[in-house]
Swiss-Prot record:
GO terms for biological process: mitochondrial electron transport, ubiquinol to cytochrome c. It comes from Locusta migratoria (Migratory locust). InterPro entries: Cyt_b/b6_C, Cyt_b/b6_C_sf, Cyt_b/b6_N, Cytb/b6-like_sf, Cytochrome_b, Cytochrome_b_C_euk/bac, Cytochrome_b_N_euk/bac, Di-haem_cyt_TM. Heme b b562 binds at residues 84, 183. This is Cytochrome b. Belongs to the cytochrome b family. Heme b b566 binds at residues 98, 197. One of its GO terms (molecular function) is ubiquinol-cytochrome-c reductase activity. Keywords: Electron transport, Heme, Iron, Membrane, Metal-binding, Mitochondrion, Mitochondrion inner membrane, Respiratory chain, Transmembrane, Transmembrane helix, Transport, Ubiquinone. Heme 1 (or BL or b562) is low-potential and absorbs at about 562 nm, and heme 2 (or BH or b566) is high-potential and absorbs at about 566 nm.
């Protein structure tokens, strides 16, 4: 009997087993589409970024002008640029939803997959931050100055590290050059990490909405889930294209339409909207080093979740109190994003501090509330 090429060919067989004939649980919901959406977002970012890099000049005298040139003179350059900028926002929306899904349904129990996913999140955040610096507008320059300056909080060696990162005594041409280099290289490292992430995921198989072993009830990924993924592909592309064609600069900062000027500080320095929750956590700690630690912890705290003692059920589906806590945390993250945009004055300072405490409390108390619920069920 002749086997099809996808099963015979050694190279195509690998792709086939991880995409076409992959056994997937029958009951996975739309929340499981986010992984493929993230893959699509990454491809959009790499392709649009590649075309942008053909026309961009990483020099402080010409960077701003080269971005203007892309938007005005390059064929469809305005579209490529807005797709790249707004594509990053879509990427982060999908990523935060993906992480939220993992927390809610207990996917963090797959330790290797969860850890590589958290590393990918860090890498993408670093890539996005460096990309924000490249247009060399006011917010690009001052954002880079403020965020890189946080490294000076490291005891003893902080100042030396900052000057090493800057390549001088201030954010200058050397900084822009190295940020451009890393912004170009990091997405390919992210791609490699995604391959490892998928490798670990396919070792265990996907989780599902009820958190039970689904080995007895699986179907091939194609055609069932490929068509299902296509629906969300189309929805995401429609949202992205509508955003780019109707209000392309809605999510940007007006200060970035002004070329970088080291002598004029913007009234309110802030990062892109998808970093505002972490920025609010940073600002809510009065001490500089404490703020930096809280900033890093706001993401790295995800890494403690696989070490939770196992509860009777996987995920929050069967824990009403944990569901309430989860949705409170979602609201808290939205409020922190809002606080990050506000000036540093009362009542925003106190509000930010209270929200920061609630945010970290979720990760500390979540497992204990679930254990308490287990005890109630037992009795």
């Amino acid at each position: 009997m002749n086997k099809p090429l996808r099963i015979k060919h050694p190279m195509i067989k690998i792709i086939n087993n991880s995409l076409n004939d992959l056994p997937a649980p029958t009951n996975i919901s739309m929340w499981w589409n986010l992984g493929s959406l993230l893959g699509m977002c990454l491809m959009i970012q790499i392709v649009t970024g590649l075309f942008l890099t053909m026309h961009y000049t990483p020099n402080i005298e010409m960077a701003f002008s080269s971005v203007v040139h892309i938007c005005r003179d390059v064929n469809n350059g305005w579209l490529i640029r807005t797709l790249h900028a707004n594509g990053a926002s879509m990427f982060f929306i999908c990523m935060y939803l993906h992480v939220g899904r993992g927390i809610y349904y207990g996917s963090y129990m797959y330790m290797n997959t969860w850890m590589t996913g958290t590393i990918i999140l860090f890498l993408v955040m670093a890539t996005a931050f460096m990309g924000y610096v490249l247009p060399w507008g006011q917010m690009s320059f001052w954002g880079a100055t403020v965020i890189t300056n946080l490294l000076s909080a490291i005891p003893y060696i902080g100042t030396d590290i900052v000057q090493w990162v800057w390549g001088g005594f201030a954010v200058d041409n050397a900084t822009l050059n190295r940020f451009y280099t890393f912004h170009f290289v990091l997405p390919f490292i992210v791609m490699a990490m995604v391959m490892i992430h998928l490798f670990f995921l396919h070792q265990t198989g996907s989780n599902n909405p009820i958190g039970l072993n689904s080995n007895i009830d699986k179907i091939p990924f194609h055609p069932y889930f490929t068509y299902k993924d296509m629906i969300t592909f189309i929805i995401l592309m429609m949202i992205l294209i509508m955003l780019c064609l109707i209000d392309p600069y809605m999510l940007g900062d007006p200060d970035n339409f002004v070329p970088a000027n080291p002598l004029v500080t913007p009234i309110h320095i802030q990062p892109e909207w998808y970093f505002l929750f972490a920025y609010a956590i940073l600002r809510s700690i009065p001490n500089k080093l404490g703020g930096v630690i809280a900033l890093v912890m706001s993401i790295s705290i995800l890494m403690i979740m696989p070490f939770y003692n196992k509860t009777k059920f996987r995920g929050n589906q069967f824990y009403p109190m944990n569901q309430i806590m989860f949705w409170i945390m979602v609201i808290v993250i939205c409020l922190l994003t809002w606080i990050g945009k506000r000036p540093v004055e009362e009542p925003y300072i106190m509000t930010g501090q209270i929200l920061t405490i609630i945010y970290f409390s979720y990760f500390l108390f979540n497992v204990h509330i679930a254990k308490m619920w287990d005890t109630l069920i037992k009795t």
